[in-house]
A protein has these predicted regions:
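Short, conserved charged micro-motifs
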Residues: 242, 419-426, 479-485
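Structural motif of enzymes handling amino- and sulfur-group chemistry
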Residues: 10-49, 54-58, 151-152, 339-426, ...
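Conserved PLP cofactor-binding pocket of PLP-dependent enzymes
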Residues: 429-458
């Protein structure tokens, strides 16, 4: 078995010194191990195609090996320890949450009740609706973090909010985003930020549907479908869909328009200036998830009313903390609204890690941008590859119009090999990169994204133009010759 890596500060793990640069977690013996080697890792190794399928089909052999998982999809062992400590009656289950608001919402959905136990808010509900509670946990992202669970288990209390550090982090985000710190809020996860945005626009126009423009990350669409009164899904996010949206807005009052810039996993770039101008003419706010584009690369604030970002990804870069942010455009349609979601905030111990990790975000992003663009061109020229999805390969894209000076095209790309049904699993298992979910880390990650995000709806994903045999790469800051050699071997 591989030996645990020694604990080191984030600053010591930057550059080529990170253990995952030298020894990625991709061997069969790594199944279920955290990526990175941290009690609070947000990714987990699924090293073979069969492991991915087994995980999705809840194969007991695979699940027994899982030491951790992505915190919204997988209840962290520390969370389960908290659940075991919270008093529950026979026939009752419990989930701890980051705030009273989240606990009460979950309780309302499950016919249960919210209680505060030793400073910790939790929802109690009948065992038969545990799946409903887990869906709330997953989709809304208003989860209790593993660090909060650890503190409560060891000391019997949670740390108080660190207002000074919260201000430091929001001012840092303000410098990158162009919005004032007073219009930025921190959240327990990226999805929690999106859910707060959803609540804000839904409250503003109650009883109205939302629009999903372009094919999004799975849980964004689930929020609009399950928590709202309906959603108009325009999966292509192209000019034809823009025309459809124009006709829709002429006949129906819409609460909000959600999109990604670029999208996950096809890296599609919506014409955000046109989309925002159309929406503004009808008084409809536009909510943009810029997690893949990042504040470093693109300036989208003039064309968005709200920007939701998963800080878990590139801004942290280490993959050991969950966090999100929501930015309000001070000149947008929601400028006079209260900052959404300020009731939950980010747990103090997580905030400390995020602040430390994010200090070198621009430096990391520049290197990852350069590596990703080289890799995209390498793959586009390779005879085994059918298609590469990356904004930098399309010189006509609106992405360049919104690109910041010194900004790149991002660190995420997807590609489809020829004869993907047979070749993709082999390439995945030959690629000497850490094999796990998530993105934005300064060590590269590869995953069969569609299999993991849409395994039980593959035909539907295919109908939206998403091939089930795509591989998504989150490109890290390894030396380019190292990455090139690894891809050359995998594709040979």
């Amino acid at each position: 078995m591989p030996q645990p890596w020694p604990v080191a500060s984030a600053s010591l793990l930057r550059g080529d010194q990170h253990p995952l640069h030298r020894r990625p977690r991709c061997e069969e013996e790594d199944l279920g191990m955290p990526i990175p080697d941290s009690a609070h890792a947000v990714s987990v190794c699924l090293p073979t195609w069969a492991d991915v399928v087994g995980y999705e089909e809840k194969d007991g052999r695979i699940l027994a090996k899982m030491q951790t998982g992505y915190p919204r999809f997988f209840l962290h062992p520390l969370i389960n320890q908290v659940r075991a400590r919270l008093p529950a009656k026979a026939g009752q289950e419990v989930l701890p949450f980051a705030s009273a608001v989240a606990a009460r919402q979950c309780a309302a959905m499950t016919g249960g009740q919210a209680q505060q136990v030793e400073g910790l808010w939790a929802a109690y509900f009948p065992t038969e609706v545990l799946a409903v509670a887990r869906a709330y946990w997953q989709h809304t992202g208003r989860i209790l973090s593993s660090r909060a669970a650890e503190d409560w288990l060891t000391s019997g209390r949670l740390q108080p909010k660190d207002d000074a550090l919260d201000q430091v982090m929001r001012e840092r985000l303000a410098g990158w985003s162009g919005a004032p710190a007073s219009r930025i809020s921190l959240h327990p996860s990226g999805m929690a930020a999106i859910f707060s945005a959803f609540e804000a626009v839904t409250l503003r126009r109650q009883g109205r549907r939302n629009v999903m423009f372009g094919f999004p990350y799975t849980d964004t669409l689930k929020i609009l479908e399950k928590f709202g009164v309906g959603v108009e899904f325009l999966p292509q996010g192209d000019q034809s869909d823009l025309e459809r949206l124009k006709r829709l807005l002429q006949t129906e009052s819409i609460a909000g328009i959600f999109c990604e810039f670029p999208s996950n996993p096809l890296l599609q770039v919506p014409h955000l200036p046109h989309l925002h101008a159309l929406a503004a003419a009808h008084g409809v706010p536009v909510i943009v998830d810029d997690t893949i584009g990042t504040f470093h690369n693109v300036n989208i604030l003039p064309h968005a009313d709200l920007i939701a970002t998963s800080l878990t990804k590139a801004i942290s870069g280490e993959g050991d903390v969950m966090a999100g942010s929501l930015v309000i455009n001070p000149s947008g349609l929601l400028a006079d609204q209260p900052t959404p979601g300020r009731d939950s905030g980010l747990y103090a111990a997580d905030l400390k890690v995020l602040e430390r990790n994010s200090r070198d975000f621009p430096t990391r992003m520049r290197q990852a941008n350069a590596n990703a663009e080289r890799l995209a061109r390498f793959l586009a020229d390779h005879p085994t590859i059918e298609e590469v999805f990356y904004p930098g390969l399309d010189p006509s894209t609106v992405y360049q119009d919104l690109q910041k000076p010194g900004g790149g095209f991002g660190a995420v790309l997807s590609f489809l090999p020829h004869q993907g049904a047979t070749s993709t699993p082999h390439i995945f298992e030959r690629l000497n990169l850490s094999r796990g979910i998530s993105l934005g880390t300064h060590y590269s990650l590869v995953c069969p994204y569609v299999q993991l995000a849409h395994y039980h709806e593959l035909d539907w994903a295919r109908s939206c133009g998403i091939d089930p045999f795509l591989l998504r790469i989150s490109v890290g800051s390894e030396p380019w010759p190292t990455l090139k050699e690894r891809f050359t071997r995998a594709l040979s």
